[in-house]
């Protein structure tokens, strides 16, 4: 989608979100929650309702629209309604506004991809015994597969973060449109499907930038402290989906792997998650950070 069409779509979605808020204000004592995307609520809503009660969900289509909504409505409505704003940090500087919850890492998708979250997915979704050899093998498999995926996507994450920093600090603008999955022209990730077809020179040529190795090194030092949290969340969740699909299908005998060589020797009770449903299905197993808990406690009604 070109920039003009995206801007038009974003404007239309903002009008819809604004209208939804205006309708919501007819409900006395309501709590309005403004999210970036349609599926963000899949992660947030259970936590919000547990602490704050019922809510009115208002997807705004993008981060810019959540920020715009705040500018337009907050000052005149903050004393009448409970208004909560949820945004992904992405590769931007922290907003540092207490009226917002901002993810500690790149996005909510990253909260599903930590080792702790994967452990809960194994025990609470796939019903793998925490003390079993299957559990140990699956955790080792997770570590190895994410290590391999990060070896492919690391340089691109450093590069894209450097681009965002250049845009902010140098008042430059680049048109880099990213899909949800890792760009096929740059390589591939997923179990048994790792390939890297790029370097910094190719990235600069492909996207019309002039990022230097020093720029990359600066981002590397920040992002590589915890790749599962700090790398682009869409690629992290792509890798998690690949791992889960592989484990489930292999255990079901669909991978032509002898049982003695499978990661999970006991077949899980659950089937593969349908496309687009992972954030909803696994929401209870994703990390629930203290930062989010503290933010929601501000809206608690005793």
Write out the residue ranges for each language-model feature.
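Acidic, divalent-metal-binding catalytic cores of TOPRIM
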Residues: 1-302
């Amino acid at each position: 989608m070109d920039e003009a069409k995206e801007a038009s779509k974003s404007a239309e979605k903002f009008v819809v979100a604004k209208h939804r808020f205006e309708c919501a204000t007819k409900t006395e004592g309501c709590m309005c929650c403004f999210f970036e995307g349609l599926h963000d609520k899949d992660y947030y809503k259970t936590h919000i309702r547990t602490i704050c009660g019922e809510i009115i969900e208002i997807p705004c289509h993008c981060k810019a629209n959540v920020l715009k909504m705040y500018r337009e409505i907050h000052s005149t409505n903050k004393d009448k309604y409970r208004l909560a704003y949820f945004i992904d940090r992405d590769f931007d500087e922290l907003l540092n506004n207490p009226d917002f919850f901002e993810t500690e890492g790149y996005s909510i998708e990253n909260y599903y991809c930590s080792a702790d979250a994967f452990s809960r997915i194994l025990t609470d979704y796939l019903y793998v015994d925490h003390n079993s050899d299957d559990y140990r093998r699956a955790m080792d498999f997770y570590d190895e597969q994410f290590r391999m995926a990060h070896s492919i996507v690391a340089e691109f994450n450093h590069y894209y973060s450097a681009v965002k920093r250049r845009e902010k600090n140098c008042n430059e603008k680049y048109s880099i449109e990213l899909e949800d999955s890792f760009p096929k022209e740059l390589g591939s990730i997923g179990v048994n499907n790792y390939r890297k077809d790029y370097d910094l020179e190719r990235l600069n040529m492909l996207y019309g930038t002039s990022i230097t190795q020093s720029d990359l090194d600066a981002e590397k030092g920040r992002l590589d402290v915890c790749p599962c949290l700090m790398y682009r969340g869409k690629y992290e969740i792509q890798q998690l989906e690949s791992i889960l699909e592989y484990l489930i299908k292999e255990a079901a005998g669909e991978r032509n792997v002898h049982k003695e060589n499978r990661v999970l020797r006991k077949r899980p009770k659950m089937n593969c998650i349908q496309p687009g449903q992972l954030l909803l299905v696994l929401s209870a197993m994703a990390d629930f950070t203290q930062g989010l808990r503290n933010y929601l406690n501000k809206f608690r009604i005793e």
